[in-house]
């Protein structure tokens, strides 16, 4: 029998279709029987339509309707009719009409579901991932995947309009150190040799600049073999772009324009024309992190003066040893925060190596301080409140330690307060640029300098002559884009001088022969008229996650791995047979 092909989607009907015969294809979302009448909510990715099998239908059709189960895939031919006023469902886009079924064809049956398919599935993560094809039918997941598609299309549209070329770089590449472990692919044709899957297209996009393709982009799949933790995925997607003859300002301005265009196109949100710029040092000093959430104010302050005016040994010791006292004024929360709740904040600070969290409550308009360490500052109430901007009803929190620990620990407390006090509006999008990052960071374990981002970022001009003598203060031409407390893009102006690149390799511990072996093809390319260039790589998964109001990138990836880098649906990674191992000249060690 010829299948009934749909003539309209389940979200496409309205009163204008009344009196017309249509064919719908979809899944039975809900079914209910009521006095000889069967109601079916038929679903596809466009929406829901109510289908009715009336009591005047043929006996065969009524019997078929009774036998239908949830998630059966069916075709329905029926007559569109307006619902009675009392039956109009304003919660449904098609709620003014219903379809009187004339024919029903079962295209495919469904077994009993492992979980209910609702607007958003509440099953545990591994069950959702095992039956991902069912999970993806939920309204929330359908909306997330469609949002991802719309956003990606808008990015392509914008960059193409700016004369960027979409160019694919290789997926099988040379293994080079980029921070995380490479995923390795053994070569059957060349025993003992391996390709790597790219952690990013970094080197190849720089070579494209040398090749004369001055504006490149790619929706790039990237692979990193990292330890299972947090919200990491072994494979992820970035909007990779690079520009020749470009300054930092050119890259930042282009990225702002791209985000403005794509946000407007995909979720109809207007972003500001320019994003706030914050130096790395300032971000650490006032927010305690290089990815601050700017949806709420609450800036940290320097409170070293309290070591001088009070008798609290912890503050005095920290300052005398060259450390810092950092303060956070939490407006109007003195009464709300009991000792127990403050201890919860202290636990957040201790994760970042703070020894404790000191506190004071302001009462009587700043004339009195109570609780915590207030007894060490008697008679200094007015000075403390004046310098810190504290008022009656405020809670003041302190961390005293080495400067970096004091900042990051109190920054973690700030982040927790933002969540606890409901200050994080998921419908608000606060972008900012973090600029002037250190080019190098000290690796305590290996007793050497590491690149803070990667080895191909250019130092700022004023540091080039002396960077070998003292790498610590060297700032790079680096920039991160942050959004709502997440780093969503990282980029830099690149090195295009082969001699400067070799100097950077040497500082981070590559001798000349090792650098030549790993990166010789790049420095060789730089010898043939390499243009100045720079770029950035926004993380597609994370940006769409934030747009969707989610907290895990798994919610915006069609087929993610779980937190242990395993796919419960297809049971990957999996063992392979001995023949495949033999062909690849591989032996599994016990």
UniProtKB/Swiss-Prot annotation:
NCBIfam families given in the database record: aspS_bact, PRK00476.1
Source species: Treponema denticola (strain ATCC 35405 / DSM 14222 / CIP 103919 / JCM 8153 / KCTC 15104)
Primary location recorded for the protein, binned into one broad class: cytoplasm
Gene symbol of the encoding locus: aspS
Matching CDD domains: AspRS_core, EcAspRS_like_N
Positions of ATP binding: 224-226, 233, 487, 539-542
Catalytic activity: tRNA(Asx) + L-aspartate + ATP = L-aspartyl-tRNA(Asx) + AMP + diphosphate
GO BP terms: aspartyl-tRNA aminoacylation
Name the record gives this protein: Aspartate--tRNA(Asp/Asn) ligase
First and last residue of the signal peptide: none
InterPro entries per the UniProt record, alphabetical: Aa-tRNA-synt_II (IPR004364), aa-tRNA-synth_II (IPR006195), aa-tRNA-synth_II/BPL/LPL (IPR045864), Asp-tRNA-ligase_1 (IPR004524), Asp-tRNA-ligase_1_N (IPR047089), Asp/Asn-tRNA-synth_IIb (IPR002312), AspRS_core (IPR047090), GAD-like_sf (IPR004115)
Entry similarity comment: Belongs to the class-II aminoacyl-tRNA synthetase family. Type 1 subfamily.
Pfam family, one: tRNA_anti-codon
């Amino acid at each position: 029998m010829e299948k009934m092909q749909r003539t309209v989607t389940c979200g496409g009907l309205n009163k204008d279709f009344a009196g017309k015969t249509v064919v719908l294809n979809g899944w039975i979302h809900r079914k209910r029987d009521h006095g000889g009448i069967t109601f079916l909510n038929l679903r596809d990715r466009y929406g829901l339509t109510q289908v009715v099998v009336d009591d005047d239908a043929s006996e065969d059709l009524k019997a078929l309707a009774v036998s239908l189960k949830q998630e059966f895939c069916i075709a329905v031919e029926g007559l569109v009719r307006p619902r009675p006023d009392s039956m109009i469902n304003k919660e449904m886009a098609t709620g003014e009409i219903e379809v009187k079924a004339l024919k029903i064809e079962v295209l495919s049956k469904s077994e009993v579901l492992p979980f209910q398919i609702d607007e958003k599935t509440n099953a545990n993560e591994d069950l959702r991932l095992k039956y991902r094809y069912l999970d993806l039918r939920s309204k929330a997941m359908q909306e997330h995947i469609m949002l991802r598609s719309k956003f990606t299309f808008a990015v392509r549209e914008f960059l193409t309009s700016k004369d960027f070329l979409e160019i694919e770089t290789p997926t099988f590449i040379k293994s080079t150190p980029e921070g995380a472990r490479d995923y390795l692919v053994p070569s059957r044709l060349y025993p003992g040799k391996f390709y790597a899957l790219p952690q990013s297209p970094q080197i190849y996009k720089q070579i494209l600049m040398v090749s004369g393709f001055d504006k490149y982009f790619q929706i790039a799949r990237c692979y990193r073999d990292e330890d299972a933790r947090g919200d990491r995925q072994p494979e992820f997607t970035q909007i990779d772009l690079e520009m020749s003859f470009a300054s930092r300002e050119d890259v930042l301005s282009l990225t702002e324009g791209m985000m403005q265009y794509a946000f407007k196109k995909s979720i109809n949100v207007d972003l500001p024309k320019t994003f706030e710029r914050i130096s790395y040092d300032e971000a650490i000093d006032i927010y305690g992190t290089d990815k601050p959430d700017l949806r709420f104010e609450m800036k940290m302050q320097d409170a070293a003066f309290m070591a001088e005016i009070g008798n609290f040994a912890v503050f005095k010791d920290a300052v005398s040893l060259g450390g810092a006292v950092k303060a956070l004024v939490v407006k109007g929360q003195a009464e709300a925060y009991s000792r127990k709740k403050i201890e919860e904040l202290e636990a957040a600070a201790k994760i970042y190596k703070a020894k404790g969290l000191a506190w004071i409550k302001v009462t009587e308009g700043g004339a009195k301080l109570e609780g915590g360490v207030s007894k060490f500052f008697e008679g200094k109430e007015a000075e403390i409140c004046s310098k810190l901007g504290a008022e009656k009803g405020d809670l003041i929190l302190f961390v005293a330690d080495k400067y970096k620990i004091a900042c990051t620990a109190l920054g973690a407390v700030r982040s927790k307060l933002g969540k606890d006090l409901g200050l994080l509006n998921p419908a608000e999008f606060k972008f900012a640029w973090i600029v002037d990052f250190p080019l190098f960071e000290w690796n305590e374990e290996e007793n050497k300098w590491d690149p803070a981002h990667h080895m191909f970022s250019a130092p700022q001009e004023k540091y080039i002559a002396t960077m070998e003598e003292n790498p610590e203060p060297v700032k790079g031409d680096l920039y991160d884009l942050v959004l709502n407390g997440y780093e969503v893009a990282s980029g830099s102006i690149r090195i295009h001088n082969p001699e400067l690149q070799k100097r950077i390799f040497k500082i981070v511990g590559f001798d000349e022969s090792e650098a030549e072996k790993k990166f010789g093809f790049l420095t060789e390319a730089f010898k043939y008229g390499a243009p100045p260039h720079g770029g950035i790589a926004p993380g597609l998964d994370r940006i769409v996650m934030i747009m969707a109001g989610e907290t895990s990138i798994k919610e915006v990836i069609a087929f993610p791995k779980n937190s242990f880098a395993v796919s419960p649906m297809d049971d990957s990674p999996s063992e392979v047979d001995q023949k495949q191992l033999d062909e690849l000249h591989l032996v599994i060690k016990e």
